[in-house]
């Protein structure tokens, strides 16, 4: 299947039966809702830039699984050059949208789950890695968006998952069947969850044997039976309900979004399960994901920073203050911090190394 365009991506969302709630009510046409649509436009930009020859070198890659050309957001990094291109791609998209484009978490999850399941299978004789490779091949071939989900509501931070008064404050396995598992709980603050075709779930902390039911990783579609999303609020988000030409809207075309993703006894077939009780490997998956995601901030936040710095400089010029020393000092400091963050992203990429599975870790 060829790479999708931004418009094709938006149309693909309309075919989903995702259950989205906002302000206490279900949103039927969430794709065109004025509060949600700017975040969809941000994701669409990841598709449109992949179609542009000027940016194809950053936005696309050759799949190590199939040999086909794929969107880099579905790619497994196989060199330090891949890691560097990832950071540069993220800076580009931050510059183009001035917002969160929501696909970084899924990309980072792909690489963390790929290497962790390989070592898990090596130690336990399971077939999770095979399951994951088949899943990722499907995602690459159909050019889909995947929400990487790690953060649980947690409850009392001083207690382990199994010791919580409410056992569902961490996502867990509540039933094991011959053909799969049933999960219950939630993932909180999930970037781009509503705008995703699938969700890739990971544990949120290192765990011990008593927490085995919480050591779970799997994939499920956004409109799976029993899956509900409560849309997260953004600062000043209701301004988008006003005149779209209003100067008070701010970034009227693009935006970010998060959601509370609730799993109300969702069935996950065995083929989409990548960890189910192997608590010894929960910490490895969390640590590897965290490394990739810190690297991501060296790109995406820097791109948005470029926009913010440019806007601040323009505001100073409009007000005739561009030559004021204290204004220049602030702009210089902002630029210094922004470029330092970018340097950190590039440096940790250049120092990357291969995992046992073959993909590269920072």
Predicted regions and their residues:
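Acidic, aromatic-enriched beta-alpha/helix-loop junctions
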Residues: 41-57, 216-219
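Internal helix-loop-helix
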Residues: 48-146
């Amino acid at each position: 299947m060829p790479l999708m365009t931004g418009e094709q991506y938006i149309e693909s969302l309309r075919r989903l039966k995702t259950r989205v709630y906002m302000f206490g009510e279900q949103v039927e046409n969430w794709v065109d809702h004025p509060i949600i649509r700017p975040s969809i436009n941000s994701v669409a930009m990841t598709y449109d830039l992949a179609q542009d020859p000027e940016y194809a070198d950053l936005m696309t890659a050759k799949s190590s699984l199939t040999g086909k050309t794929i969107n880099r957001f579905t790619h497994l990094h196989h060199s330090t050059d891949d890691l560097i291109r990832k950071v540069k791609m993220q800076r580009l998209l931050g510059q183009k949208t001035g917002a969160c484009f929501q696909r970084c978490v899924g990309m980072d999850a792909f690489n963390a789950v790929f290497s962790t399941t390989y070592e898990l299978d090596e130690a336990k004789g399971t077939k999770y890695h095979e399951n994951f490779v088949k899943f990722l091949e499907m995602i690459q071939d159909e050019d889909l968006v995947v929400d990487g989900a790690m953060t649980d509501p947690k409850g009392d931070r001083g207690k382990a998952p199994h010791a919580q008064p409410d056992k569902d404050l961490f996502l867990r396995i509540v039933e094991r069947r011959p053909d799969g598992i049933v999960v219950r709980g939630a993932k909180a603050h999930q970037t781009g969850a509503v705008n995703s075709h699938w969700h890739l779930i990971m544990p949120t902390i290192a765990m011990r044997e008593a927490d085995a039911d919480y050591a779970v990783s799997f994939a499920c579609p956004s409109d799976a039976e029993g899956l509900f999303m409560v849309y997260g609020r953004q600062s000043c988000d209701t301004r988008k309900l006003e005149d779209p030409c209003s100067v008070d809207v701010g970034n009227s075309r693009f935006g970010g979004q998060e959601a509370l993703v609730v799993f109300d006894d969702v069935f996950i077939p065995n083929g989409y399960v990548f960890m189910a009780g192997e608590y010894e490997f929960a910490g490895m998956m969390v640590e590897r994901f965290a490394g990739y995601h810190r690297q991501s901030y060296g790109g995406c936040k820097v791109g948005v920073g470029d926009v913010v710095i440019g806007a601040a400089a323009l505001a100073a010029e409009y007000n005739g203050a561009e030559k004021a020393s204290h204004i220049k000092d602030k702009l210089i400091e902002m630029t210094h911090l922004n470029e330092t963050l970018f340097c950190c992203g590039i440096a940790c990429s250049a120092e990357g190394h291969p995992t046992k599975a073959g993909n590269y870790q920072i």
